[in-house]
Amino acid sequence: MTTSNSPTPMHPVSIVSLGPGDPELITLKGLRRLREADRIYCPATSQPDGTLTSRAADILRALDIAPAIIRPFPVTMRDDRAAALADYSAAVRRIAVECAEGRRVAVTAEGDAGFYSSLGYISALLAERSIATEHIAGVPAFVACAASEGVVIAELTEETNILTTLSSADELLDRLAAGRSLVLMKPSRYASAVKEALAQAPADVAFHYFEHTGADATRAYYTCRRDEIATRRFPYFSLLIVRRE
């Protein structure tokens, strides 16, 4: 009887994009990879009592993924990214062990993993360890928001700018005057500029404002009325689509 000394095969890590939060918006391929996985790692936030909360884990449970294979890992949420990078490094060390033992591992991202997602750090750290990855696309939040209200983002040759920062109301108005439609991500960072533009923009400019769309039905909010938008606080999970109509 011979004994094989061949190494344990190492499967590529699946980076699975979950979409904006509605479990039904995950792709069929993404769901298949989750069901094939032996371990699923998902980012989580540490609470004051030491527990971890994870929107990604909530989505996985809604998809009937076995809780026993879900592995939340804490990610520090601060402007100083050093602590978060340390958290990603710790998660990758755990993932590398799982891979070396022959397990199929998936890592999840809300929205799309290649669109303003911190999972780029995970992919880079895995590459440094020569661990292959497979990226599976997801529905970005702004696409889900537009679909939820039948909003057109762009047509024909219209240019679209996706912004996460804005220097002033004038910058927003200048982009509109150049014939561009705008997707304003993370508007809490520049709320004053947006609200100033609300008061100055021509009447044919539509401001579509969304909160928690596709993620939390109890908190989801939409309006295209400028006076209502001006009163909102622009929470973290908010965005606007702005264009001439």
How would you describe each model-predicted region?
Residues 13, 176-245:
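A contiguous loop/helix-start segment that scaffolds small-molecule binding in enzyme catalytic cores
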Residues 90-97, 152-164, 226-238:
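A polyampholytic, Gly/Pro-enriched intrinsically disordered region
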Residues 47-50, 140-143, 191-192, 215-217:
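Short gly/pro/ser/thr-enriched loop/turn and capping motifs at secondary-structure boundaries
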Residues 2-24, 28-132, 220, 235-239, ...:
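Class I S-adenosyl-L-methionine
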Residues 111-178, 231, 245:
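Class I SAM-dependent methyltransferase SAM-binding "motif I" and its flanking Rossmann-like core
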